Each structure stands twice: as C-alpha cells, then as structure tokens.
C-alpha cells in the first residue's frame, strides 16, 4: 500500500515539496549550500586520488621498501650511509642497485618469506588494494540506501581514508609493510566513498526546487521519486512502493512518453552538477599537486632527506590527508542526512538483530549483481563491450602505476619531476574530455570508432618504451624512454587518451543497456572496472621480479591494450540498443507476471532469466 502524505509548502509558499516515499524521508528542497557540501567531498577526495594514488603513494612505497631492502647479488643495503657512522642524520646515499639491468643488481625485500623487487612490492600492494576495493564496493553498495547510512558511510570512509594518508608520517622503513596496509585501507575508502557520494546525486536532484518548478510548469503533480531518483506519477505510486524491498532487479518503468533524444530536467541538472563536481575536484588536485611540488622543493633544501629519503614524501601525504579531512568536515556540516527507508519494519526489527539485516543486505548486493550479470549475458553487444572494458580498464590502471615507478627507478627522476609529470597528465586529461567530442564530430566518427582511435594512441606508450631494446636506439642513449624528458610527451598522450576513454566508454555503454535498468547495469560496469584492475599490476610485478626491470612490463601492457580493439569493433551500437529495448519489455512484462512471487525466501524471476531475446 502506498504511503500517502500531503505535500508541505515552504514558508514562502513558493517551493512545494514532493510527497515522501516513506515515513521520515527528508524532502526539504535542495539548497545551494547542500550542493556545495556535495562538491566539497569531491574536492576533498580527488586530491588523494590524483596526488596520493596517482603520484606519491607508489613512490613512497617503493622508497620505504628500498631503504629497508638489500641488493640481491651482495645482500648489502640498497641505501647506505655516506659516512662511516651509521647514526641517522649523518646523510645517506642511494646505492647503485641497477647498473646494467641484470638480476644481480635488484633491490629486494622479504615479503612473506619471498624475495620481492621493491618496485614489484608497490605493484602488488596496489593490486591487492584494488581487489579489496572491488569487494567492498559490491558488498556495501546496498547499505547506503537505508536510514542514515548514506551520510554515515560517506563520512566514515572519508575520515578513515584521510587518517591513513596522515599516518604515513609515522611509517619508517623498518615497518614498511604497514605502509602497504595503509594503502589498501586508503584506496578502499577512496573508491567506496565516491560510490556513496554518487548515491547522493539523485536525491539532491529530485528535491531541487528547479525540478519541482519544471514539473509544475508542465502541468504535472509533484510526485515521489522511484529508486532511480526519477519522478513517478501518483497513478503508478501504489505499484512502485508495493514492490518488495528485494526487487531491485528492475528499477522503474521504461520511459515511453518522452521523445527520443530529449533529456529530462532531472538528467540535465544531474549532468550539470556532476560535471562541475568533476571539474572542481581536478582543479583542487592540480592546486595541491603544485603545493606538494613546492613543499618537496623546500624540504630538499633541509636536512630531512638526509635522515630518510621518504620523509619529504610522507610530509606531502600528510598534507593530502589534512586536505581530505578538512573538506570532509565541510561536507559533514553542509550535507543533509537525507535518510533512506528503514532497514526493517518494527516487527521485523523485533525479530532480527541489526547485524543480520546488514548481512542480508550485503548478500542482496551480491545477488543483485549476479542477477544483472545473468541478464547481461543474454545481450550480446553488452557482454562483448564488458569484456573489452574489463581489459581496457585493467590496461589503464596498469599503465598509470607502471609509468610512475618507471620514472622513479629506471629514469631516476626526482620526486619533484614525477609530480610535474602527474600534473602534465592530469591537465591533459581535463583537456582530453573536451577535445575528443570535437575530434569525433569533425571526423564524423562513431562512438566505438572514437574509442578505437583512443586505444590506438594509447598503444604508442608501451611501444615507444620498447624501442630501447633495439640496439641502434640503445646505443644512441635516447629514444625509447632512455632520457627523463621523453616521458613528458607520453604523459600528455596518456592524459588525453584517458580523458577520452573514460567519458566515451561510459556513454557508449549507456546506449546498450535496457532502459529502466540503468542503476543495475552501471553497478555491473563499475564492478567490471574495479574487478579487473588488480590483474595487470600483479602481472607486471611478476615480470619485474623475473627480469629486474620495470621496462619489461611494457611487453605485457602492449598486448593488453591491443586486445580490446577487435572487441570494440565488433560491438554494433544500433543492434545493442534494439536488444536493450527488447530486454526492457521482457523485464517489465516479467516483473508484472512474477511480482507476487518476489521477496520469497528462494524464489527468483526464473521466467525472465530463461527467455531468449
């Protein structure tokens, strides 16, 4: 039965609130202050993503391990003191641990009884971090929609993540393994918090006064929103709310009244807020990156680097953590709680302990993902694209981590130079997001052809690095990433391509999915992204251990980047769209036929899953 409530009116009598979907829902009109609270968290966390994960965390991990490591050939310390005295503070000098690129000069540390290259240690850490992040994202995605969990989880992830960054100031080389643990926790909190942050957006949009005004001008009654944050008519309200809480497989009706190609006011506002949030986050990241470079330059003039080569880097991570924590506090003050429905009815709460309800929701999240995957398998174009995205997202993640470590260990670039490289890639990525639509329009490229062009340019990066294996170029000492300056043009290529791939792949996937199931399929898209990104770094880490060179990873990366091209070429967007529309009809019809069976302890919509398109 629907929950009926008379829509309240604001004190000024101008902005009318929509009726709540459930008792206790906060339908207060969204204010600019609240939107800025949403922006504030993007400003907070994007700094850790770019300056921490994308720049200084890999360097810190490798340097901490190196200062505790030994040379594989002689078992001498990789870092030795410059004076006979072994007391800290007398100055240190990094030993030459790779003179001719042979295994005998590797700097290694012992991890779980295994001798691991210090660069591999960083790659393995990020591989584990991404895997844990993927498992956490899937498990906790459903919890954010209930009670006050949305804001509680956002703040918890933000505060814990920022603390992990700040705690690096206390991590010395003898306890370098703790740095790996902090990275896993920090990366997990970062990714999880962005998912929770995105869950605020439909709620903010649905309660925005401009949306309410737009619907009023169109002669529509203000109505509650469905699970997608979309307005539903009062005549559909009973059906929408009476659905069992477990039925999130189909999340609304297929839109039939809106003309093709027209964008709803909700979609326009959501896109505008989202794009501005991304832009502000990147601007904040560039600002803090510049501050970090200035800090590194200033600290290089002090005695801190003589005590430990990681101290300046740890001070940068302290700055990043303080920034993340500070702007999370702004979000805490400006974002409203916007609670979701209760986890259980009063009777259910009496019968079940709270932890059992949370476990049930975690199981529900995995069950929902599995249901969506079984439907996706029936959509040929969707499954081909997801396989391509699985490979492509892994390649993008692997290139980023490998490039930072290559610049540091092979090219011997300073931390300041690596910071400048990160800024170059970030600014290029921002430019790429705007440039590729222009290129695609000028060349009249289809979306999948634009993606293929981006991938082809991406392939330039590992191929150029492999040129150093050609004797002629190796003799020259230039070409093939043998000089530090060569990596900056490739950083521009990486940024431009990454910006185009991120935007085009997401929008192209949106053309293929069944209307009305966007939330479920984008959850599968995100799981595919995060679920694959731990494989590449782990394999590159093994190659580094086997060869003693980061450069050897370019062979694997070159193959990994090429694999998605034929798959993207095979995707027929028009057929995929038609299949998606057909599946939407099947899902809607099946939901009506099996609505009475949903929510049972063991029943599933086997009818729709057994059908062929």
From Swiss-Prot:
Keyword Glycoprotein part of the UniProt annotation: yes
One Pfam family cited in the UniProt record for this chain: ATG22
Gene3D superfamilies linked to this entry: MFS general substrate transporter like domains (1.20.1250.20)
Region feature (Disordered): 1-30, 592-613
GO annotation, biological process: amino acid transmembrane export from vacuole; autophagy
Keywords: Amino-acid transport, Autophagy, Glycoprotein, Membrane, Transmembrane, Transmembrane helix, Transport, Vacuole
Gene Ontology CC terms, in alphabetical order: vacuolar membrane
Membrane topology: Multi-pass membrane protein
Carbohydrate attachment residues: 90, 448
Cell compartment(s), UniProt: Vacuole membrane
Principal location: membrane
Residues spanning the membrane: 41-61, 120-140, 167-187, 189-209, 278-298, 307-327, 382-402, 418-438, 453-473, 477-497, 508-528, 553-573
Domain of life, source organism: Eukaryota
Record's function text: Vacuolar effluxer which mediate the efflux of amino acids resulting from autophagic degradation. The release of autophagic amino acids allows the maintenance of protein synthesis and viability during nitrogen starvation.
Similarity annotation: Belongs to the ATG22 family.
Protein name: Autophagy-related protein 22-2
Species whose genome carries this gene: Aspergillus fumigatus (strain ATCC MYA-4609 / CBS 101355 / FGSC A1100 / Af293)
